[in-house]
């Protein structure tokens, strides 16, 4: 059984704003397992930051239960409220590192002093603190920049220092709240790859809050989509990308734009006669499970012709995932058998109604 490191149950966070109740987080439950890189995505104001601030009780919930590494930090029921004692919460918080969009480094201190600062509370000798800080800088690829000042570093390098500092107390969990939002594309990719490496090498569990689906696509294994204080859809990265149900998810993952492009092509496509012997299919598949021989096979075995209207390939973590919109022409029975064949070969098949083409 995978070990649950974060268990949020029925969390609500309500704020009072000008006499009105703002439901920033509304009855959200979320479990994160050891070694996950759990992407929490949604537009600004969806409640992502508020939800993750609950994990280490930087934000106290209005209702719900917070368990980290098996220990209950907070539980509020109708009858009572239980909160972990302050002296126990402090070390618990150290199990959870955080990085943000703003790096929050101390400008007047050198890079290594910034990292050492996070180790000061430990009963370590000066020398040990310096050695540990140096080790952390090496881990994030900045072993030779310890004597520089933050202003002398690029944004990406400053975020690396912030990551080294967040790891100073050997946390099991790292919360990344929009950590790449202020970075250019190159630095964004480098920071995401660093998080992926730390996840792999240190078995660090990462909660990745972002409004950028590309970030999630690159490193997350699981995704929760938030809208108006609630999780509207969740699943493995592959599920969310190949089988999104909620309109916002479709928009975020690009299914909506793929579908719009395919429909625009179909409207002007003479191969599509809108006849009773034709189906429009939306296929998604992993790796290279669909290739030329498949269309040949469908023709030979089921007497259906498959013509590709639109295709796109995304890379999820390291796996290519393809999207195809095809017109399948042939007898109803043959088309049904061909669809069964595709499904049996790990292809997700969705029939697109003809209305979609007419009304789009
Ligand atoms: N301390 C607070 N007091 C009052 N309202 C708050 C407070 N913190 C957050 N909110 C409100 O709660 C809602 C959710 O905010 P939150 O920051 O969690 O969203 P988000 O999805 O992280 O978006 P962003 O990326 O813009 O921060 C917003 O409407 C915000 O204005």
Model-derived features with residue positions:
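Helix-to-loop junction immediately C-terminal to a conserved catalytic motif
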Residues: 56
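Conserved signature/switch motifs of ABC ATPase nucleotide-binding domains
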Residues: 148-151, 168-169
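Conserved ABC ATPase "signature" region
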Residues: 72-75, 116, 120, 127-144
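The feature captures the beta-strand-to-loop junction immediately N-terminal to the Walker
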Residues: 41-43
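A short, surface-exposed alpha-helical micro-motif characterized by mixed small hydrophobic
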Residues: 216-218
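ABC ATPase NBD coupling module
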Residues: 73-97, 121, 240-244
């Amino acid at each position: 059984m995978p070990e649950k490191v974060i268990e949020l149950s029925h969390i609500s966070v309500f704020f009072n704003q000008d006499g009105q109740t703002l439901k920033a987080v509304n009855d959200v439950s979320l479990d994160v397992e050891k070694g996950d890189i759990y992407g929490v995505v949604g537009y600004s104001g969806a409640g992502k930051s508020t939800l993750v601030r609950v994990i280490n009780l930087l934000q106290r919930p209005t209702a719900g239960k917070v368990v980290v590494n098996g220990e209950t930090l907070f539980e509020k029921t109708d009858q009572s409220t239980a909160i972990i004692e302050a002296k126990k919460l402090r070390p618990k918080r150290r199990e959870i590192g955080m990085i943000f969009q703003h790096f929050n480094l101390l400008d007047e201190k050198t890079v290594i002093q910034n990292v050492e600062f996070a180790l000061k509370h430990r009963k370590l000798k000066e020398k040990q603190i310096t050695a540990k800080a140096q080790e952390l800088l090496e881990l994030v690829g900045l072993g030779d920049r310890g004597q520089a000042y933050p202003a002398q570093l690029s944004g990406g390098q400053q975020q690396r220092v912030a990551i080294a500092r967040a790891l100073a107390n050997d946390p099991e969990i790292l919360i990344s709240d929009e950590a790449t939002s202020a970075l250019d594309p190159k630095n964004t990719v480098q920071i995401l790859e660093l998080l992926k490496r730390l996840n792999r090498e240190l078995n660090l569990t990462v909660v990745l809050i972002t409004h950028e689906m590309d970030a999630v696509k690159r490193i997350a294994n699981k995704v929760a989509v938030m809208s108006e204080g609630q999780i509207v859809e969740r699943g493995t990265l592959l599920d969310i990308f190949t089988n999104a149900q909620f309109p916002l998810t479709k928009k975020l993952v690009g299914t909506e734009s793929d579908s719009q492009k395919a429909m625009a092509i179909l409207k002007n496509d003479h191969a599509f006669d809108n006849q009773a012997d034709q189906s429009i299919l939306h296929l998604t598949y992993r790796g290279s499970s669909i290739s030329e021989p498949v269309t040949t096979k469908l023709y030979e075995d089921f007497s259906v012709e498959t013509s590709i209207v639109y295709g796109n390939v995304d890379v999820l973590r390291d796996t290519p995932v393809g999207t195809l919109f095809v017109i399948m022409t042939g007898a109803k029975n043959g088309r049904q058998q061909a669809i069964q064949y595709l499904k049996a070969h790990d292809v997700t098949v969705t029939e697109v109604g003809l209305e979609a083409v007419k009304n789009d």
